[in-house]
Amino acid sequence: INDDPKCHLKHFKQLPACDPLIDKCIECGFCEVNCVSNQFSLSARQRIVVQREIARLKQTGQDPARLAELEKDFLSLGEESCAGDGLCALSCPVGIDTGKYIKQLRGDHLSAKAQKTGNWVADHLSGVTTAAAVSLNVVNGIHSLVGTKALERMSTTARSLSKDRIPRWTPAMPKGASAPGETEINPDGPRKVVYFPSCIARSMGPAKNDPVQDSISAVTIRVLQKAGYGILFPAEMKKLCCGTPWESKGFAEIADRKSAELEKALLAASEQGKYPVLCDTSPCLYRMRNVMTEKLKLYEPVEFVHEFLLDHLSFTRKNVTVAIHATCSTQKLGLTGLLKKVAGMCAEKVILPPDVNCCGFAGDKGFNLPKLNEHGLRKAVSVVQQAGAVAGYSNSRTCEIGCATYTGIPYMSIMYLVDEATQPRIDKE
């Protein structure tokens, strides 16, 4: 093949040190099956390859023009289009979370103005979530006045004129919601739980045409009451957040500060871990489990229903076909099977579209980079529609918005399905 007896010692592919988070990568590509942006922009493997080339060019001083071009293009192809969900780590032989690395890069690129804005939002979260809910209600009112097609045209025009700075509107966009009060509900109940409605649940309600118009907080409280629970809430709940929105944008210090505030409030409400804590949003719960003390017994909806409510509720299957979406955090928590099991207790037929991992909504990317969301759900649409599913269920409001947008059926929290299929189980009381 070659006359050079030392050819096997030459022309090795260079793998320059780049960052400890990704330096172990052997570029095998096993991550790509779980990467939602694969074949859309860059895969997790390709992000690492580009970052290594950037590191090499910086180290050698070669080709400054190429370096500048790579750094510029990586902002959109590498950073902005990365969902940051961490599913790549599940199939990586050495557990590399490229999403974590991208979040670190986002943090490195934050301006002083962005830091100031991030801190301001964190310090005024109650007002921010209230303003978000009011804005959503205003848009919903416009929707009622002008109709779907007219509002879609208006949204498309506004988005184009703003150069995509204004989020995309679809009929699946929710109305505003509000936080429940902090007074204990059903204080004489034989069991107690601390319920923390996420900031998303406190600001985003159902869509205009969803079959149930109660908020996720109202539905969750109803299910807990049916099961005989006294419901406690953390103090000053409206200003609390797990920190996930800041973490995803690279504001690591702010994210940790908000997590610490929430942890302190949950410890007080749960009497130092005496009572379980339920959070209605899976991505929030995932972060809480990773950063908070083990004293807290933390649960997302599916796991809480399975562990605490089965003995206190009577389930009646509805004669319908429903779809479910396992969020990235549900998959990382190993709860996909449990989601299907709980849904199967409530509906005769449950559809979990194969070959769908991250939906691509990724926090706010479904609003600001909707084509990533469309790409992430491209294999789900026909499966859900051909199965004749009448509704879909998950455990993250933003993911549900994306799923509803592209499948054409309403998506809601799994707690809505549990509520519809259950009654108090009197014989167990």
Question: Which residues fall in each region the model found?
Answer:
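Glycine- and acidic
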Residues: 17-20, 33-36, 73, 83-90, ...
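Short, intrinsically disordered, charge-biased short linear motifs at domain edges
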Residues: 10-23, 67-70, 76-79, 227-231, ...
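Iron-sulfur cluster-binding electron-transfer modules in prokaryotic oxidoreductases
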Residues: 99-429
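Non-heme iron-sulfur electron-transfer modules
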Residues: 2-14, 38-74, 95-121, 409-419
